[in-house]
């Protein structure tokens, strides 16, 4: 069970603690500044906060004392872009605009394995994966993934350029990583990043022309998670539905949920591989809860069926949307947190059956994480 929750928002980082009377907010950190990602390193408790300051660039901060004091870390830096004899071709439906070789945002941040002290992984926009071996003091771009020829086909999903928003480190083998790209599919390495394979068999992209519907390199997984106890079981909330894999992401099967299979986020039960939670929405045109009613859907049978959970959530009309990193489950599998685009934060202590609103007046929430 985790007694601390990090909430990254458009106007700062909030830290909540579980007390005898419930979850309590403490004074905000980086007030007024957009915090795109936060991490509590499970190995040593170090906190990390990634900020996107627009014209002032991307910043990364680190705290070794629970947030009492913060120090600046290095940020990932792309190498110089090679000069080419010819300018890039103009964008076409089959050729998206070339991504810049410069950091736009830290979109995901994960600790390495338990046997890799100091190792961090950062997924970024415009699509580079970076590794730090020293707790954020320095970063190295993973060139084998960045140099894949398929990367030229990746394109932005929600942002102008593609980005890595999900990184799953296999707890049984730290050299086995799975990452998800919007829009660029799911990629895996078994050797710590030396070689990569696109593994999206079974996914489909209905937003593409029919002949490219099954193209693995342009799939749009919105969020990728794995079951901690059985990492070969993975879940994806995709632009075109919900997908589940039982063979470490090599094959995917879709699942149909009501009131919608569209959404941005998913959380996997850490102990029960058949259980996962989603937050459904209306696809494409509206991006709102179905019929203006916020619910959480839960499957406890591997996606064969879903139940809509709404006790404690606002009745219709309600237009809260939950971003990719806006839903989290703790290591017990019983406590969940959910933060919305309208600044509402809820906690459930019983696996999603009942929700309690901690605050309805926070800034728009980008990410919630226990730790």
Name every feature range the model reports, one short phrase each.
Residues 1-371:
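Extracellular glycan-interacting surfaces
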